[in-house]
């Protein structure tokens, strides 16, 4: 069940591929409070997951529309690759890495979203940092509780998610360790080629 929720969260994160940050149009309905932002988006996603009258393709499209505005994809790509490696990439390589990285996550996990079975969500108050905010959440299944932590920062006056921890483990840092291993033995082009390969089953 833990792997299911990891799959759902990563599906949310990878719901839209972008190559570079661009200023977004004003949205008067975009929540200014980060607690409200996370709560509103999760409730909307759960509503879609619980709707058995729509097929999987329609479900994914609806989730894309709900959550795609709230993630800082450019920062997520930088953090996943790491400060040591990111500046070494050309602009073209950076854009390609973002696309391949997000597509890899999407391909690996989004099929599992269909396994959702009405687990309970408990939202918790935000933990304020100097320039960021952490918002914890607990997912209750029949036999366990799963701790989820959303990490947010402000981008163009909007709160955006830049990482998610599950049971204390950062999704981005997990990928960084894999990328570090590849780059320690090869080049950036080797990494991009690996990301173009189908993910292991």
Report the location of each language-model feature.
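Short beta-strand edge/turn micro-motifs at domain boundaries
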Residues: 145-173
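Low-complexity, intrinsically disordered terminal/linker segments enriched in charged
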Residues: 163-201
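Early exported N-terminus immediately downstream of N-terminal targeting peptides
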Residues: 28-109
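Surface-exposed aromatic
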Residues: 86, 135, 161
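A mature extracytoplasmic/lumenal domain signature
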Residues: 101, 125-127, 139-141, 152-154, ...
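N-terminal export/membrane-targeting signals
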Residues: 1-19
């Amino acid at each position: 069940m833990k792997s299911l929720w990891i799959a759902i969260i990563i599906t949310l994160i990878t719901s839209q591929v972008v190559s570079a940050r661009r200023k977004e149009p004003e949205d008067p309905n975009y929540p200014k409070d980060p607690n409200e932002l996370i709560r509103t988006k999760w409730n909307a996603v759960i509503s879609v997951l619980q709707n058995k009258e729509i097929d999987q393709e329609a479900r994914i499209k609806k989730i894309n529309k709900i959550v795609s505005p709230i993630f800082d994809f450019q920062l997520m790509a930088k953090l996943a690759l790491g400060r040591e490696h990111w500046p070494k990439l050309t602009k073209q390589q950076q854009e390609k890495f973002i696309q391949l990285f997000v597509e890899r996550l999407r391909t690996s996990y989004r099929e599992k979203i269909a396994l959702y079975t009405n687990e309970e969500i408990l939202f918790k108050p935000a933990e304020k940092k100097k320039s960021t905010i952490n918002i914890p959440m607990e997912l209750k299944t029949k036999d366990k509780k799963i701790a989820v932590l959303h990490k947010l920062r402000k981008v163009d006056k909007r709160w955006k998610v830049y990482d998610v921890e599950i049971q204390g483990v950062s999704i981005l840092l997990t990928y960084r360790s894999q990328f570090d291993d590849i780059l320690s033995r090869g080049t950036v082009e080797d990494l991009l080629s690996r990301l173009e390969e189908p993910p292991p089953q």
